[in-house]
């Protein structure tokens, strides 16, 4: 049996402000830093260790990983940074308040943009300052692979090559693997691992800063999965994530 640990970054400044973030490189709040440290403590207390870690190229995930490594005294563990683990690109919604957007377009439309499998938000214009083309962290990524908007289906398509070519082989080689990433890049991976349908993926909500453990068989098919920590608090955090895209009315 193999184990794989996933963690969504701690609360970011735009999580706190209930804004669509996507590829915008915002940092953690103090609460987010605290969540990440607590995640590291939980993992250490539960006896976990890691041989390699994967994260995105966005600081909220990177800093979360730093905190986890620090708490576990694993700062030496090699880290793979990949744009393929970035959050889903929210296109023209990037930076907008989720509740205000829902009040303008309706809860149903915003739910479709946030959680449907194959409907992306409106795209950025190529010349928009939020477009990734001029960002040095993507200098080696072919321009045609860089998105101006994404649905979850698109996110799955960019996450899976990293899983198939690097993460899965590491797990099968017996390495203890940690992935510190984002709500939708993790939803994309979980959809693939658990075989969740396009319709049912809408209901999957991942809380910030809580370690999610997957136990996998020899073919990397999930046997079971579970969150570490206070289960009641985790359930409340998942419910809060589900409420983010609804209007205040």
Curated annotation (Swiss-Prot):
CDD domains xrefs: HP_PGM_like
InterPro entries: His_Pase_superF_clade-1 (IPR013078), His_PPase_superfam (IPR029033), PG/BPGM_mutase_AS (IPR001345), Phosphogly_mut1 (IPR005952)
Reactions catalysed, as given in the entry: (2R)-2-phosphoglycerate = (2R)-3-phosphoglycerate
Biological-process GO terms, alphabetical: gluconeogenesis; glycolytic process
Keywords: Gluconeogenesis, Glycolysis, Isomerase
Residues binding (2R)-2,3-bisphosphoglycerate: 8-9, 15, 21-22, 60, 87, 90, 98, 114-115, 182-184
GO MF annotation, one: phosphoglycerate mutase activity
Active site: 9 (tele-phosphohistidine intermediate), 87 (proton donor/acceptor)
Superkingdom of origin: Bacteria
UniProt site positions, description: Transition state stabilizer: 182
Function as written in the Swiss-Prot or TrEMBL entry: Catalyzes the interconversion of 2-phosphoglycerate and 3-phosphoglycerate.
HAMAP family (alphabetical): PGAM_GpmA (MF_01039)
Protein name in UniProt: 2,3-bisphosphoglycerate-dependent phosphoglycerate mutase
Species, as recorded: Burkholderia pseudomallei (strain 1710b)
């Amino acid at each position: 049996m193999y184990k794989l640990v996933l963690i969504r970054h701690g609360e970011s400044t735009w999580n706190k402000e209930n804004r669509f973030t996507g590829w915008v490189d915002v940092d953690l709040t103090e609460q987010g830093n605290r969540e990440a440290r607590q995640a590291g403590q939980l993992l250490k207390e539960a006896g976990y260790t890691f041989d390699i870690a994967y994260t995105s190229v966005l600081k909220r995930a990177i800093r979360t990983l730093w905190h986890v490594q620090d708490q576990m005294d694993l700062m030496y563990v090699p880290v793979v940074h990949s744009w393929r683990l970035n959050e889903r690109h929210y296109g023209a919604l990037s930076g907008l308040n989720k509740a205000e957007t829902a009040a303008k377009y309706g809860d149903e439309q915003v739910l479709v943009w946030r959680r449907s499998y194959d409907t992306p938000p409106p795209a950025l214009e190529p010349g928009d300052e939020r477009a990734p083309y001029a960002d040095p962290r993507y200098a080696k990524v072919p321009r045609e692979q860089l998105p101006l908007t994404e649905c979850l289906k698109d996110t799955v398509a960019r996450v899976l090559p990293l899983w198939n070519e690097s993460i899965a082989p590491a797990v099968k080689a017996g390495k203890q693997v940690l992935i510190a990433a984002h709500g939708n890049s993790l939803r994309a991976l979980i959809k693939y691992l658990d075989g969740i349908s396009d319709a049912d993926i809408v209901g999957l909500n991942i809380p910030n800063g809580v370690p999610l453990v997957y136990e996998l068989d020899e073919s990397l098919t999930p046997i079971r999965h579970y969150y570490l920590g206070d289960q009641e608090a985790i359930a409340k955090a998942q419910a809060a994530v589900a409420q983010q895209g609804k209007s205040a009315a």
